[in-house]
């Protein structure tokens, strides 16, 4: 289930905000096995310790804070990505207004193959845009997570490169990490700039193009 408008650029900083002493959450994609939510924590607020049955992945799109995993504090700031493994107690604290994309598995499945970057294995936050480099005349992609019901991929496009129209079996969230990209959904084009996101609905043809400049994006497919 998609809970925000699809096939258009959205600035999550405008979509979710927290006033003093508030923690605000919003689930934007909700599927049988995985989901995507937004969080906004006012300065010096905290989500208290809890443990989940599936892995959690966090992308910070505003501010900075700390995510403590089994009492091990991990700093996170704008542009950073961090994995929290299932069944680990963790909490989130904001040092200023902190906004996060939370990507979650509802139930972990240890039998599913999960291909991850070595950076995820370090259990520390890292700059997502730095995962892939630009290569002249090429499209570069790296999977951070590759499971049957959840895929998180970081991609770079050289100016002029494109992906032909195709369909995905699940709803996808794209977040532009650098530059700007042109997206065409069911024949209708729109631009998504750095810091903006868009939902590409399942089973509807869409294409991607680096029309005016190089760009990078995070693609999250949930099923």
Task: Label each residue range with its predicted role.
Residues 1-33, 77-78, 97-99, 106-149:
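A short, N-terminal "cap"/entry segment at the start of jelly-roll beta-barrel domains
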Residues 21-24, 35-52, 137-141, 151-168, ...:
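Conserved short histidine dyad/triad with adjacent acidic residue
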Residues 32, 68-72, 95, 184-188, ...:
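Short strand-coil-strand connectors
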Residues 53-70, 169-186:
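Glycine- and acidic-residue-biased ligand/ion/polar-headgroup-sensing regions
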Residues 61-62, 77-78, 96, 177-178, ...:
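A cytosolic small-molecule/anion-sensing beta-strand core signal
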Residues 71-87, 186-203:
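Short acidic-glycine-tyrosine-enriched beta hairpin
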Residues 86-111, 202-223:
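Ligand-binding loop in jelly-roll beta-barrel domains
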